[in-house]
Regions:
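Nucleotide-state sensing region of NTPase/ATPase domains
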Residues: 46-132, 138-148, 241-245
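Structural recognition of the conserved hydrophobic beta-strand(s) that form the central parallel beta-sheet
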Residues: 70, 342-346
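Conserved NTPase motor "head" modules and their coupling/switch loops across ABC/AAA+ ATPases, GTPases
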Residues: 1-29, 43, 172-320, 328, ...
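Extended, highly charged alpha-helical segments
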Residues: 123-190, 194
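Walker A/P-loop
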Residues: 35
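Residue-level signal for inorganic ion chemistry
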Residues: 58, 211, 346
């Protein structure tokens, strides 16, 4: 966990140096930079802000760069740093360092500093597109299945190449080339699905347990559902072949692991006595949805902390970032959080 945090030229934080405990409560007036402190940790961990993706939006006004540096508990040489820079045209560049050496990619820092964010914006998770929910699952898989990330990168590279080829005017004369890409894309799609499915099943179990604590009246009516994005019973390459004309017409790949989704279903009975399932977001009140999303995230935290505690790995416990704690967590959720992981930044 973070022992020392230095922030330079991030929003209204010109120069901040903090020594942190394992659990921290940040207080201050509105606009004093409380959320920016959380943003700094998230930026260091994920390489992007949870408020704005464009560096020019969070680099201090009239400055060309911002830097976040952190030292963790344990080995005094264990340090992480990220610098976001703007050139004269406003284009951004990123410099990463781990233990004083240049880091090859953001994944190096992400693995060393996992972060779980609970904030007001995240409470719209159920109403957003599938991408946000897929990222929620993939964050968990990334930290529990370390081979997942390289396979995910390969899939994204192949998908980009396939989509580019689909847009070419000469595509009808390059179908054999497309078939070669499809074979590799299919292989990695099924590999990603296997990892996601395994971790999802464990997550779903912890989610049901968390519902019993936060939304006991709905524990047996709500269920977590994972959709792979393609028919996993058959090779993806066969499905891609059968839909090649539609993909060429659209200019992109409509099915695959990139279309995976996670949703929460609400079980009920209609007037004819038939059992039906609907999206929970259409049924629950705003307050109930907030508790539901809290259950999703705390069940993730519980799962990953339990896995680390029962393993011999050097994996790091997640840092939990909570923006506006009174608004986002009720007393029950706060007690669960403190019991689950006492090594978090809050």
């Amino acid at each position: 966990m973070i022992q020392q945090l230095n922030i330079h030229k991030l929003r209204n934080l010109e120069q901040v140096e903090l020594t942190l405990a394992r659990c921290n409560l940040i207080i201050g007036a509105n606009g004093s930079g409380k959320t920016s402190l959380l943003e700094a940790v998230f930026l260091l961990s994920r390489g992007k802000s949870f408020r704005h993706h464009e560096p020019r939006r969070y680099i201090r006004h009239h400055e060309s760069d911002c830097t976040i540096w952190a030292k963790t508990f344990g080995d005094p040489s264990n340090t992480l740093a990220i610098q976001k820079k703007l050139d004269t045209q406003g284009k951004s560049d990123t410099l990463l360092r781990f233990n004083g050496q240049t880091a090859a990619s953001q994944s190096v820092l992400s693995f060393q500093l996992p972060t779980l964010l609970i904030d007001p914006v995240g409470m719209s998770l159920l109403d957003e597109g599938s991408g946000t929910r897929r990222q929620l699952l993939d964050w968990l898989v990334f930290h529990m299945k370390h081979e997942f990330y390289q396979q995910w990168l390969q899939y994204q590279r192949l998908l980009k190449q396939r989509n580019s080829l689909l847009k070419q005017p000469s595509i009808q004369h390059r179908l054999n080339e497309l078939l070669a890409w499809d074979g590799q894309l299919s292989y990695y799609a099924h590999a990603l699905h296997e990892h996601r499915q395994e971790i999802f099943l464990a997550w779903a179990t912890h989610f049901q347990q968390m519902l019993g604590l936060l939304l006991p009246e709905y524990q047996h009516r709500l269920s977590l559902q994972y959709v792979a994005g393609f028919d996993t019973k058959n090779p993806l390459i066969d499905t891609l072949k059968s839909r090649i004309d539609q993909d060429i017409e659209l200019g992109y790949t409509r099915i695959g692991a990139h279309r995976a989704d996670v949703s929460v279903l609400f079980k009920s009975t209609n007037d004819q006595g038939q059992k039906i399932r609907e999206q929970a977001t259409h049924i629950l009140s705003r307050g109930e949805k907030k508790l539901l999303i809290t259950a999703l995230k705390l069940s993730q935290l519980q799962l990953i902390c339990n896995a680390i505690s029962h393993s011999n790995s050097d994996a790091t416990f997640p840092v939990v970032l909570i923006d506006d704690i009174d608004a986002e967590l009720d007393d029950a959720a706060m007690q669960i959080l403190l019991r689950t992981d006492r090594k978090s930044v809050v």
